[in-house]
Amino acid sequence: MKATSYPMWRVIPMVWLALGVCAPYASGQAVLNIQQATLMEPDQKTPEIATEELRKILAEQSATVFDARPFNEYAVSHIPGAVNVAAKPGVPSSLYVSDVAAIGRVVQDNKAAPIVLYCNGPLCGKSKRLAEELLTAGYTNVRRYQLGMPVWRALGGITEIEAEGVQYVREKDQTAVWIDARDPEEFTAHPIPNARNLPLSGVKPGKDVGEVKKAKDDGRLPMEDHNTRIIVFGRDGAQAKAVAEALAREAFHNVSYFAGPLERLRTAAVR
């Protein structure tokens, strides 16, 4: 059944964002744009960062960004540049929290290391639980991107999929659309089963132009359900990422790309 309304799990964060953006305006302060918005929750033990700041952190590699979700969720789609660690032992799934000791190994036990956490958005508690455990362990520079994955995607962010995620989606999600970003000659000579070709060479700057417009019109892209999972791969990660970014600009908000070599994806996809 095709979706007929915007998913509530996306509506709720966007409403919260609207409240965050409008509040400064109502009080006479400078108006923020949506990329600069946070939840502005009172009495939080760790500060939040906005989407704009997270993008800057990722570009500059000025902090270690941790995906605070279980590995399988991370493997299927995560913010590019984020890392993931194992779960804290002995904790039930309902109270999932990452292992602080494993985080320590990533940051070489530097308690002053800049750390950013994210999870499944405004209503997800994983980042807050992990932040509190890090503070208890003595870490002093912990921030949260509490808007998380839903708002990252809603604001045009793409995600990255791991080989384990490729295998999972192949087995579990028959609605997923697989986009091959290679040139038509490569696509034809060495195809990936069930993939659709949308070559980067045909992608043009702007909206509704070039090969992307053609793919909308000829059925290669899921125009009647923009919630559909789209996974982009190519000759290499750079090629795949460029096409994924082009699709995200066209309001497809569930777009992931595979950053590894093509043969690794092929192996994962045909297991």
Regions of interest found by a model, annotated:
Residues 54-57:
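Post-signal-peptide N-terminal segment of Sec-exported extracytoplasmic proteins
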Residues 65-67, 178-180:
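Structural scaffold elements adjacent to functional motifs in cytosolic proteins
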Residues 69-71:
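Secreted/periplasmic proteins that engage bacterial cell-wall peptidoglycan
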Residues 2, 12, 16-51, 75-117, ...:
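Rhodanese-like catalytic fold shared by cysteine-dependent sulfurtransferases
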